[in-house]
Amino acid sequence: MKKTLFSVMWLAIAGVFTITALSACSDDDNENKSGSYVIQKNGVVEPSQQVDMGVFNIDGKKYRLIFAKTNLTARGLAKAESDFGDFFSWAAPEPWCTAYERTATSLTPTAWISGKADGYTLANAQYYDGTRYTKYQNENEQLLPEDDAAHNLLGGDWQIPSRAVWQALVDANNKSVTWGKDGEMKLTFIDATGKPGMKISSKSNPENYIFLPATGRIIEKEFLSVGLHGCYLSSTLATPYNIWAVGFGEGSGGVFTACRRMTGCAIRPVRLVAE
């Protein structure tokens, strides 16, 4: 059988990224889906969109980590590996930004869901009542399935990776996987779009890899470090106000607690298969 685990982090790097045109936040090809939290189900994700990264020790047990090939969007998975997908706040059921403008040096949000026009703020944060968070208050507490956007959108046992999952993937660098060429954690390009990111490859089967675009993150209405830094949610709470997340930049990466619950970050779904 399979067991559910979760986690979160980020790494601050300032910078700009040269891109052009108007874009929707979601580049996706799947319809909105939801379903019961059923173990041993692939949900709505096709086999071609799943990547077997090998077996890892997660909290003392061995699991095969099956990652989605692309980032999560409001309606499923992004079309291309280099697509940013959508930016989710922790425990939120949907992204608040629905479109952004790409300029020569930045991304600028241009559309929001109803009630979230102020952006990724504390006041808008899921389960914040104006004075405190009313749900999830304990260190290392995990998101429940009903608050996991990856599970709710993809179904099956898909989930946001836990802190333990991300940490296992980081610790495996130059052992069972490589982060960037030769494990040096250098950013690279995966296609002609010119969007940089981190390529994490299985050492035993280099054709099995995931590419994490350097999405940056969004705080309030400002995108930060786009093209220089990747910030991906975990399902694990660090403090009542902060979460664990995985972050990377040119030559560095790890799991950190500097990500606030209301920050908008990318999600790379995973499912765990017990060995």
Residue ranges and their predicted role:
Residues 20-24:
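C-terminal motif of bacterial Sec signal peptides marking the signal peptidase cleavage site
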Residues 1-12:
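Bacterial N-terminal signal peptides that target proteins for export
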Residues 2, 32-63:
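Structural boundary micro-motifs
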Residues 49-133:
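A short glycine-rich, aromatic-capped structural motif
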Residues 27-41, 55, 69-79, 83-94, ...:
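C-terminal, surface-exposed recognition/capping segments
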